[in-house]
Every structure is written in C-alpha cells, then in structure tokens.
Amino acid sequence: MTISHIDPEYQANTIEPSVQQDWENRKVFKVADTVEGKHRYILSMFPYPSGKLHMGHVRNYTIGDVISRFYRLKGEAVLQPMGWDAFGLPAENAAIAHKVAPAKWTFENIAYMRDQLKKLGLSVDWDREFATCTPEYYHWEQWLFVQLYKKGLIYRKLSTVNWDPVDQTVLANEQVENGRGWRSGALVEKRDIPMYYFRITDYAQELLDDLDTLQDGWPQQVLTMQRNWIGRSTGMEITFPSANTEIYADGLTVYTTRADTLMGVTYVAVAAEHPLALKAAENNPELAAFIEECRMGSVAEADLATAEKKGMATGLFVKHPVTGEELPVWIANYVLMSYGSGAVMAVPAHDERDFEFANKFNLPIKQVIDAKGADDADYSATEWQEWYGSKEGKLVNSGEFDGLEFQAAFDAFLAKLEPQGLANSKVQFRLRDWGVSRQRYWGCPIPMINCDTCGQVTVPEDQLPVVLPTDVVPDGSGNPLNKMPEFYETKCPCCGGDARRETDTLDTFVESSWYYARYASPDFTGGMVKPEAAKNWLPVNQYIGGVEHAILHLLYARFFHKLMRDEGVVQGNEPFTNLLTQGMVLADTFYREAENGKKTWFNPADIELERDEKGRIISAKYSGDGQEVIIGGQEKMSKSKNNGIDPQAIIDQYGADTARVFMMFAAPPDQSLEWSDAGVEGANRFLKRVWRLVASFLEKGNSATAIDKANLSKDAQDLRRKTHETIQKVSDDIERRHAFNTAIAALMELLNASNKFEAKDDNDVAVEREAITTLLTLLAPFAPHLSQTLLAQFGTDLTEATFPEVDASALTRNTQTIVVQVNGKLRGKLEVSVDISKDELLAQAKALPEVQQFLTGPTKKEIVVPNKLVNLVV
C-alpha cells in the first residue's frame, strides 16, 4: 500500500474543525437507548450555563472524554451525554442586572457554551442534550413530586429557615457562610414560612448502609464526608420533669449521646423557638426580645458552633431525673430546634460548648469523668482541656454510679430511668429532611394548589407539566409569579372552587438529582426514563466531578435513585458505581492594594513577568501601565481573584488537543493542577514532535507491514518491547489507575524510542510502523484530532480503530544487562544472553578490558547475582 504525504508542520487550527465536522456528519458518538454487547455509561457533572467555559470545565470534561474514548477503543458502546443545569439564582440575578428574561439569557449562554464544548473535541452524543429548564424535562420531576406527596414522602410545614434579605430566598444551612448568604453576602435572618420537605430522613439508614457497597469505587474522603453528614448516633432520650408544673407541665425531653455524664448536668438549655422558651417569654419582655435576637441569626449548625455564646435564664426549673435536684432552664443560641427535641442537658465539665457557656454566665461545673491514664491531671473549671470531652475514663462524683465506664454507665442509667418512663434508648441522625421550596421565579414550579376549603391539593397528572412562564423579566423585588394572576389563579381539582397555584419553585438540586437517568432516554414521553433504557444504561459506570459536591449533590442523587427505584422507574440501589473527584485548577494571582486595604486583581494575561534562571517569577508588571503588581501566589481560578485563563484563548492559539494533553499531563486527576504557560507550550511541542515523526516516516514511502518476529535485529526487538510495554502501561494507567499523566509520560518515551530508531530493512520498517500506529492509537483518547488525522494516513479510521493487543512474546528479553564489579565497585557492563551459563558469564566478565586492569591479585571470591551483577573480590 502506498502511504500518502502530509504537511511537515502541525497545524491544529486547520485539522481540528474538519475532524469535528466529520464526527458530526457521521454521528460517530451516537448510541441507541438499548445496545447489544459490552457497553458503558461515562458521565461528567453537567455544567451550569454561566456564559463561558472555565478551565475547571475543561479538566472535568477532558477526563470523562479520555475514559470514554479509551473504552470505545476497547470495543464497548459508550454513552457520554451532555446537558445543562439551567435553573437557579445566578440566571435570575444576571437577568435582573441585564433587564432580560432568564430564559433568553440561559439559552444564549447554552448556545455559546455548546460551541465551546464541541471545539474541545468531546465524544458526546449531542442528540441526548437537554436543559433542565424545559417543560419536557421538569414535567417528570413534577410527576415524581406528586407521587411522593401522595405517599407522604413530601410534606408541608411551617419552618424556621435561613432567609437571605437581598436575594429574597431561603438558604440551605450549607449556603450560609459565617452568618452570611453564600451568594449575596447579606446577613442572614430567621423566618417562619411554609415549605415543602422531602423525607430524606426516612432513607437515612439505607443511605448510610449502602455507602459500604461503594467502598471500591468511591474515594474514601467522600464516603467519610457522607457518613458524617448522615451522622447516625445511638443515644438516650431523657426526660427532666418540670419543677414549675403550673406553668409548664410536661417537663423537658432531651436527646444525648453522653448519658454517662448525666450526674454532671447543672442546667438545661433550650432553643429560642422551643415551646417552653415561648411560654416563659409571655410575661417577660426582656426574654421575648432575646428570643427575637436569636431568631435573626443563622440556623446553620456550623455557624452556631462558632458564634459567640448568648443566653438568658427563663426563670423556670426542671428536676434532675436521678437526684430530683432543681436545675435552671436557659435559652441558649447554640441549641438547634431542628436537632433532637430542641433542648440539651448541659454538662459543662465534659462538653466544650456548655463549658464556654457556663463560664460566661457563672453556672456550676461538676466533674463526673476522671482522666484515664492521667491520675495526676487536675480538673480546671476555667480552662478547657482535650480529655474533658473523652468517653474514656470512669465515673466520679456520681453516687451509686461511681467507677462505671461509658457503656456500663449508659446501661445503668437506662435500667434506672426507663421503668419510670423517664428514659429510652434511641437512634438519631444528624441528617435533616430536605426543604425544597424556593421563593424565586427561575425554577421548576411546585405542582401544588392551595385551596381554602381543601387545603393543599396536588395538580392532577393530566394537567402536568405546570409550565413556568418564560417571558418574565424579574426586577429583583421578590418572586414575580406572585404578581401574575394569570399564573396563580386556578380552580381546585377537588371542589372546583377558586384556588391559588403554588408560586414557590423547587430547589435546583432537585433537577441535578435525576438528570443522569434522563440521559438514558431523553425524548421519552411516557415517564422519567424508558424502562428498557434504564435497565440498559444505569447505573452510571463512571461519574466525574468536583469534590465540592461530595455531600449535597451526591447525597441527593443517591436519595433520588432510591425514590425512583421505589416508584419502579429504575433498578438497583445506587446511581454511580465509580466516582472520580478531580482537583481544582490553580493559577497565579496578581494584585495591588489600596491604602484602605482594598485589593484590585489583575488577570495573568495582562501581566508581564520576569523570571530567574530556574523559571521562578521574580517580578510582575501590569501591561496597562508598566507598573509593578504584587505576586499573590497560586490560587483556585476564580472571578473574585481575576485569575481565570480563557480556554478559548488556549484553543485558538494551540488547539484543543494541546489543551487536553496539558490538562491530563500536568497533575494526577484527583490533585490540584497548577496552570503553567510553559506546560502548555511543552504539550504543544510534544504533539508537534509526534506530527514530525509521522511526516518523516511517510516521506520515506516504505509500506512494509509484515513483521518477521524470528529475524528481528536487536534494535527492532527493543523498539517492539517498548511498544508493547507502552500498550500495557497506558491501558493500566487509564483503566485501573486513572493516572493519565503517567500514561502520557509513557507515550513520550515511546515517541523518543521511535525517533531514535533507524530502520535498515523492511522488517525494521514494519516494526517502526507498528510503533508509530500504536503511539497514535494510544494517544487518541488525549489528542483525538491529531490521532484521527495521522492514522488516516495509514488507512485507519480512528472511529473504527481498536486498542492494540499486547504481544506477550515482544515483552520477553533475549538479552540482559549485567553489572560487573571488582571489590564492590562498578567497573563495567555486559550485554549477554538471558540463558548464559554461570561459567560463561564469569569468563566474559573477566575478559572485559576495563575490568582486567583491576584484577591485579588472586581472586578470592566470585559472586554472581542472577540477571543482575557479577562481583569479583580480589
């Protein structure tokens, strides 16, 4: 076969558009809803259509694409879809700022970002694309909501929530940072509003147990974070009888995991919203004002843990269940109404928050646990020590319970109090039910109707979807749906009377909790997912995304999979068999600081750098004025630090393949990647060298393909061995280890070996050809445009190519390198047959001229370490 000639220089901007057009024309990445044979579902977390891709996107989607292309080469049908997480606050805020409808803003962004993703060369089945803001998608979300509401898995209740007064919406606890809204930065308030909740707590035990099934496929860090978030604890509910029965007859029930410290209780603390607190405040204006102050703060657990401890005595008392001693009841801002019963038994001697509170308000502190292994450790009531909170040690100052250790004490208190109706053992979870109502416009409408006669009624299934009006330009003052009678005025499905449609929309985490399943059959009109498509493609074999989603998104998606399973929509218990959490992309930061401390950040593209001989930055100047800026070090690429690198600029200058290779080579995927212009140039040089190697080979015009293995020269044997070692390593690095950086390093070694090889006959040419076509095929997952273009010169269509098989015979070595030492010092090396005899090896070692000059005396000892060395002791 005659081999064609190619341009000697690599021109990425010429080849990439034509290759991408070829893929699109032939729909080479399209898969059916059901396929025969081996198949695999690879999914990277879908993007929010913010307007432009950032480097985090590029890294995420390149990782997914490398894995997808690898398995296609292995002969599997691969589903790799793409879509848009399109609802949410940012779109609404941007729409307010630009005075445009969120729908228009969103779909314009999608169009631009879709084009950017296609230019990355992703092997995506674009026929499966959808945006979550379309009625065709959220129809089925509403359908599931209705089913779950009817089953009691969704309920409505008045709830104290975090209210962001700027964004005019409820925030989840995780969206409150240091008492402020995560997006607006406004001080968060507390409000009581009616909200819909998913009973995720009904699934808490299963969500916890099933983490064990993910042990081999998920990072331990993520499993640990989820276990801690679900937070299963076994404790005791203890009732402290009321000492003021005329005011509050019921007493106080608390939940504790430290029942062993019961004899150290010196006060009881309740949340500001607790019924006892409200009762005590009825005739106490000062207490009522304090309760209102507490209500203005965040309800996020992390914030309460670190906030200044505030409290006020209610004037009410309860009785210690064992001793009958009267204990004061305090309102404390560190007690959560949403956890347990909203009341805690305070043991200042052995709980750090109680200790801090008791010292601030001069409350008694009573030690009831000794210091295990530290008999000489004195208990100080003024300075907290780590051992105070330990479960180790024995009870002291606890009367009949003295000397008991943790579990024995727990059992003893339960045995004493349970018959009196004052205690019972209880399992509790830290996980709270998921509040999904959002007082915003740009979200999925909640399919509920409020009727004065019938209460809350689900929208009939034949009236779904409840379609969100899209021609709305919000002005920032609350939810525009509340100003649209044409949306909210309706009839009650039960009584036919006038009713009001729910104007709250769903938390956008709901959309991203089931999108992975919809990709299996995105056009299906009969339900959330076509049953046979779900059976074929689910669960996702490999999921890829940032570790920042370890708790919320991944927990909610796991929850939704179980909900859909119980509705008969999907099979199996878990949505994602394997999870890869990629690290952040870091870049240099540069800034100037004003006298008032305000920092102005400059983009790296606008900075002129001076480096020392080791390449380290020693000075930086802003190109706009030539003046110096401060070098801030490498941080995560972000808008706030203005250190993002535009992927489009890299693609325009170097091509997508260079961006992909750099991203995969610069760091292991689960670690932070430090952006480096020199690294990008290095990746580009590597691809240019591959191109030149192929151009040079084609220039010679020799078409020999048949390898005569029995008559290979030593150099040809070495190149074949390198070729097949590389196949072995790249396969293992991609499939098992996800070590894409070392896979590329192995390809660089094969390139070097191929460049050094000089073919002397047709057999050599065939070996060189094998090395080059193998290099191109193994490189294809990383640099698909270049590989497809160059493989075509050898008559191979990349889209139909298969991953090379390892020839075991090529890996065997006929010769070996032996080190020769005299008195333990290296004096020479031998290249000998692998089956050489010991006597022959010693003879050749002694015959080496560079060895002979050191053999001046009689040889005392001859040491041979097989396959490694000869040591002659003289």
Curated annotation (Swiss-Prot):
- Top-tier EC class: ligase
Chief location of this protein within or outside the cell: cytoplasm
The subcellular localization recorded is: Cytoplasm
Q: Which residues form a coiled coil?
A: none
Per UniProt, where does ATP bind?
639
Membership in a protein family? Belongs to the class-I aminoacyl-tRNA synthetase family.
Q: Per its record, how is this protein called by name?
A: Leucine--tRNA ligase
